[in-house]
Amino acid sequence: MEAQYQSTNFLLQKVQHDLGRLEGTQNEQDAQVVVQSIYGDISTLKDNLQALDNYVSREQPARRQAARMRVDQLRMDVQRVDMAVSAVHTRMTQRWRSASEREELLSARYRPNDTALSIGDHELQLNDRLHSSHNRLDELISQGSAVLDNLKSQHFSLRGVSRKMHDIGQALGLSNSTLQVIDRRVREDWIFVIGCIVCCIFMYAFYRFWRG
């Protein structure tokens, strides 16, 4: 029993020493090696304690109480070291995770190529939209010009018709009311044509102002 006790006590001291090494590691890879070694030793310590309990049960009654006290004290030391290792490992795991997340955040934030590409894509989309808007305005102006030319031709036709109607009316002796209706229609057409001209001028001015 004494040899088993001394061996277990020596292994406990090794675990305590390795715990200090664990706290001094600088990177996760080295720390994982130490952690695996410590957990393996703790598992061995628990097996040794079980063997010591068997030895104590076989001791003579006069020596059994003293042996039990030594083994119980050793068990308490092992439990304290086990809890300390778990606490240190948890704290270091959180530190590694925080460092990894911080590194990922910094690498995602400072990527000049991606930023430049994003800005270039945005400018390209904006340029496409401006070009599309210019084409639509050009189409509207072309349509307005075509409508204006059509109205002008219709107006000249109406003026020719109006003159002919006046001539025919005078030749046929149409009443003044009929001639007044024709004149009013011609004036309304003039107002409509002028309104279309003003609308086209406004559209052209807005287009020039918008393009800068």
UniProtKB/Swiss-Prot annotation:
InterPro entries: GOSR2/Membrin/Bos1 (IPR027027). Residues 1-189 are cytoplasmic. Signal peptide: none annotated. The keyword Membrane applies. One of its GO terms (molecular function) is SNAP receptor activity. Keywords: Endoplasmic reticulum, Golgi apparatus, Membrane, Protein transport, Transmembrane, Transmembrane helix, Transport. GO terms for cellular component: endoplasmic reticulum membrane; ER to Golgi transport vesicle membrane; Golgi apparatus; Golgi membrane; late endosome membrane; SNARE complex. It is a single-pass type IV membrane protein. It is found in: Golgi apparatus, cis-Golgi network membrane; Golgi apparatus membrane; Endoplasmic reticulum membrane. The keyword ATP-binding does not apply. GO terms for biological process: protein transport; vesicle fusion. Involved in transport of proteins from the cis/medial-Golgi to the trans-Golgi network. PANTHER family: GOLGI SNAP RECEPTOR COMPLEX MEMBER 2 (PTHR21230:SF1), VESICLE TRANSPORT V-SNARE PROTEIN VTI1-RELATED (PTHR21230). Part of a unique SNARE complex. This is Golgi SNAP receptor complex member 2 homolog memb-1. It comes from Caenorhabditis briggsae.
